[in-house]
Design a protein with these regions (language model features):
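Hydrophobic transmembrane alpha-helical segments in integral membrane proteins
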Residues: 2-29
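Short aromatic-rich membrane-water interface segments that cap or initiate transmembrane helices
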Residues: 12-17, 78-92
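Alpha-helical transmembrane segments in multipass membrane proteins, preferentially the mid-helix core
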Residues: 31-35, 101, 130, 153-174, ...
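Internal transmembrane alpha-helix with an interfacial aromatic "cap," most often the third helix
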Residues: 33-36, 88-121, 125-136
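Membrane-interface helix-boundary motifs at transmembrane edges
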Residues: 38-50, 106-115, 139, 168-178
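Helix-loop junctions on the outward
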Residues: 61-87, 129, 133-138
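Membrane-helix boundary/juxtamembrane motif in polytopic membrane proteins
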Residues: 114-119, 144, 165-189
Length: 201
């Protein structure tokens, strides 16, 4: 079988566990998408764009993880290759949107929003594209090379989100400044997991 993920080796119990988690993910993403679109009217106008983006992210993820599950079933039955690209196609769309959502929810001045969007969206796309060749390679040297290249825009994104946002704290209302401080720490904690998981076999 092509690729580095041979799902035909899964036991019946392992297959059921993966299927169950994917099913739970479908339900969660569908419910979240519906809720977010219906909740727009109850959100302040300046935050509605962030809500729409959030709903779009979960809708895109719902579609791609359904495709992952469909490929997973076909590959497990034998005769077809498990399509490893669906996750990266999903991330290529959703990660830039998540960054746009982060910028939108902070309610920064228009000039700041445009500047951050222009820098972060291309960097996030480069990070995903550069990471894919290493993800699908079983060779650790190849994985390390592409992982290193992907880390350049990854670190740039963290730099912009942490350092550049820090520069705006003094000019922001106290409630916005507090949100930015918490967000910086959350981003470091959550995004820091990705390089570790990328290098795992």
């Amino acid at each position: 079988m092509d690729g580095i993920y041979d799902v035909t080796t899964l036991t019946a119990d392992q297959y059921m566990v993966v299927s169950g988690f994917l099913s739970m993910g479908f339900a969660a993403m569908l419910a979240t998408t519906i809720y977010l679109y219906l909740a727009q009217a109850r959100v302040l106008p300046k935050y509605r764009q962030a809500i729409v983006i959030s709903g779009t992210v979960t809708l895109i993820a719902l579609y791609h993880y359904w495709r992952i599950y469909d490929s997973f079933k076909s590959a497990h039955a034998g005769g077809e290759v498990f399509n490893e690209a669906y996750r990266y196609v999903d991330w290529l769309l959703t990660v830039p949107l998540l960054l746009m959502e982060t910028i939108a929810v902070l309610a920064l001045p228009a000039a700041n929003r445009k500047s951050l969007t222009a820098r972060l969206v291309p960097a996030s796309a480069a990070m995903i594209i550069l990471g894919y060749p290493g993800e699908v390679s079983a060779d650790m040297a190849t994985k390390a090379i592409w992982g290193g290249l992907s880390s350049i825009p990854f670190l740039y994104i963290l730099y912009v989100l942490f350092v550049e946002l820090t520069k705006t704290l003094e000019s922001q209302p106290s409630e916005v400044a507090a949100t930015v401080k918490r967000l910086r720490l959350l981003l470091i904690a959550t995004w820091g997991v990705y390089p570790i998981s990328y290098l795992l076999p």
